[in-house]
């Protein structure tokens, strides 16, 4: 997967490899030129000193310039690859159903798209900056070191075997630790996100200490894992350096006698030590980068999990003709993922196009679940749902979204402008269409008072608006597309009685022919509906007009009388 992403930057990658070749060539030539300069100094050959010195400086400059260019190329490739991965992951997430989202959870997905992709970006950059250079530099330095002083080949082999063994052991031990670290990082992000989103609840019930204790518990586990990893590397790195420096000192001690008897080998000794230093550099860097590479491999696996996940539901790709607004449930049974007990049980009913239908029942009866099945946010395990006589599982997503609009119980706004939020309901909505939607939702008054009207800014989650204003904008977003079926999932609960009545009057006047389904806690919200469905413990136990249900349905009558008593 990563290789395919890098292929999109093949010319930059090729240029980076050329720069890497120049850098390695420069590094391998410099000790050889240094050897020749030292030998020329011993013989007093000034002309050779100047000539070789010129080439030494030129080669060093070429390596320096190539290194600078390579840094730019590596950064370009790494940032491009990470951007492509992030876009692919986000595009994939957009196809996920609620079930897919719940499988990962939102905090987990955010960590994967930020922290994990940053880990991959860092390693891609290091790969083109350093990792590609290391094996070539290692092999070249090893060969040239043996050619320079063949008698010391065994010192090199011993050093390499010891360091490689330690590096392999370290990476094997740290893999599970890095995986656990990423999991803890997800948890701490999820806790922080949950706490910030629910800050009003936390403060209202004075639960700051409990939330802090929950956060610090995971934070301490995260710290413990991080310290373990740090301690492990703090032990391994000095040991590797001791092995490396031991090889240098051993080499110098072994050749010291040679220099006394034959001063001309001083250049060879200097060249050998330089090559040995480069070998040490490559091995130590591999060990040092092993931490990042191991983390990145785990991160890549986690990104692949997103990209390889198949959406829990698929849609017909062929756009359908416009559907009419009739709706029918036929023996629908639905159970949420990871739950055992169905939330809806064998529910059947028919709604004619243009009807206003209320859905009532006690908390947990399945009202909101029923609403979420209509736009196909979930699929039932049994039975079928039909709109305009067509099973919604055979309808394209585009057609279904144009036909059905839902106004959720909790008003969710996005940062941007009021117009941006209304156009979530219809991407090409005109100003006149937005004005009409705002008028129906009783939002025109407060929007018109704002200096920028529909271009007024909306902060994250709409925190610069009151609950009632957010709900009105949410309703406007739902009606702006003039859908065939409009669902209110208890979405008028944040409105006062007068505003709720005005919204219903506007709906009756401006959306004639639209099938309206109102999920309500208060029977007063649906008392004038053409039909009311009564749910109890996931079953449809009655349907009809208000007066008929009061007379014939004990559950409905009990809810009605209880609410009526409270109002009185």
Spell out what each predicted region is.
Residues 1-8, 109:
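A short amphipathic helical element positioned immediately N-terminal to and/or at the very start
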Residues 7, 11-69, 73, 146-151, ...:
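Transmembrane helix-loop-helix hairpins at lipid-water interfaces of multipass membrane proteins
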Residues 8-10, 95-99, 115-124, 128, ...:
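An intracellular "coupling" helix at the cytosolic face of ABC transporter transmembrane type-1 domains
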Residues 18, 26, 48, 66, ...:
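Hydrophobic alpha-helical transmembrane segments of ABC transporter permease domains
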Residues 28-32, 68, 72, 138, ...:
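Membrane-embedded alpha-helical segments of multi-pass transporters/permeases
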Residues 43, 79, 87-111, 115-117, ...:
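Short intracellular "coupling" helices and adjacent cytoplasmic loop segments at the cytosolic face
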């Amino acid at each position: 997967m990563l290789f395919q992403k890098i292929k999109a930057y093949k010319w930059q990658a090729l240029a980076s490899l050329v720069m890497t070749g120049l850098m390695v060539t420069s590094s391998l030539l410099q000790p050889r030129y240094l050897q020749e300069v030292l030998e020329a100094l011993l013989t007093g050959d000034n002309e050779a000193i100047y000539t070789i010195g010129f080439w030494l400086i030129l080669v060093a400059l070429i390596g320096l310039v190539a290194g600078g260019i390579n840094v730019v190329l590596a950064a370009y490739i790494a940032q491009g690859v990470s951007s492509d991965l992030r876009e692919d992951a986000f595009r994939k997430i957009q196809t996920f159903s609620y079930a897919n989202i719940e499988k990962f959870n939102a905090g987990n997905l955010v960590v994967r798209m930020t922290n994990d992709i940053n880990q991959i970006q860092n390693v891609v950059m290091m790969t083109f900056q350093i990792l590609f250079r290391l094996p070539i530099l290692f092999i070249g330095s090893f060969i040239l070191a043996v050619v320079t002083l063949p008698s010391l080949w065994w010192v090199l082999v011993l050093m390499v075997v010891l360091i490689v063994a330690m590096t392999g052991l370290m990476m094997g031990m740290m893999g599970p630790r890095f995986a656990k670290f990423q999991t803890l990082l997800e948890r701490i992000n999820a806790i922080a996100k949950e706490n910030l989103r629910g800050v009003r609840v936390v403060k209202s019930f004075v639960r700051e200490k409990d939330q802090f204790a929950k956060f610090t518990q995971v934070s301490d586990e995260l710290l413990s894992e991080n310290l373990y990893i740090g301690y492990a590397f703090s032990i391994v790195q000095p040991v590797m350096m001791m092995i490396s420096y031991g090889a240098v000192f051993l080499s110098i001690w072994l050749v010291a006698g040679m220099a006394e008897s034959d001063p001309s080998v001083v250049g060879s000794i200097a060249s050998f030590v330089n090559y040995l230093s480069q070998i040490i550099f490559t091995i130590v860097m591999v060990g040092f980068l092993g931490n990042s590479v191991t983390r990145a491999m785990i991160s890549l696996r986690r990104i692949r999990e997103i990209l390889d996940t198949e959406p829990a539901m698929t849609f017909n790709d062929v756009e359908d003709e416009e559907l009419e607004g009739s709706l029918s449930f036929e023996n629908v049974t639905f159970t949420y993922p990871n739950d055992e007990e169905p939330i809806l049980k064998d529910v059947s009913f028919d709604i004619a196009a243009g009807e206003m239908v209320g859905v009532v029942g006690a908390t947990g009866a399945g009202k909101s679940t029923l609403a979420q099945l209509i736009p196909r946010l979930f699929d039932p395990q049994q039975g079928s749902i039909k709109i305009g006589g067509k099973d919604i599982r055979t309808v394209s997503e585009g057609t279904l979204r144009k036909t059905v609009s839902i106004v959720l119980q909790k008003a969710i706004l996005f940062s941007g402008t009021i117009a941006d939020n209304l156009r979530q309901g219809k991407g090409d909505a005109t100003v006149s269409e937005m004005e009409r939607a705002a008028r129906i939702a009783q939002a025109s008054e407060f929007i018109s008072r704002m200096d920028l009207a529909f271009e007024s800014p909306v902060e994250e989650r709409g925190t610069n608006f009151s609950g009632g204003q957010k709900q009105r904008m949410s309703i406007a977003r739902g009606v702006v597309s003039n859908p065939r079926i409009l669902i209110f999932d208890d979405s008028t609960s944040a409105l006062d009685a007068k505003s709720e009545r005005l919204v219903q009057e506007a709906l009756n006047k401006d959306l004639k022919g639209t099938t309206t389904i109102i999920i309500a806690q208060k029977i007063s919200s649906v008392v004038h509906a053409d039909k009311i469905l009564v749910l109890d413990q996931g079953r449809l136990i009655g349907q009809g007009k208000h007066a008929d249900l009061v007379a014939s349905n004990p559950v409905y009558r009990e809810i009605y009388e209880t609410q009526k008593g409270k109002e009185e």
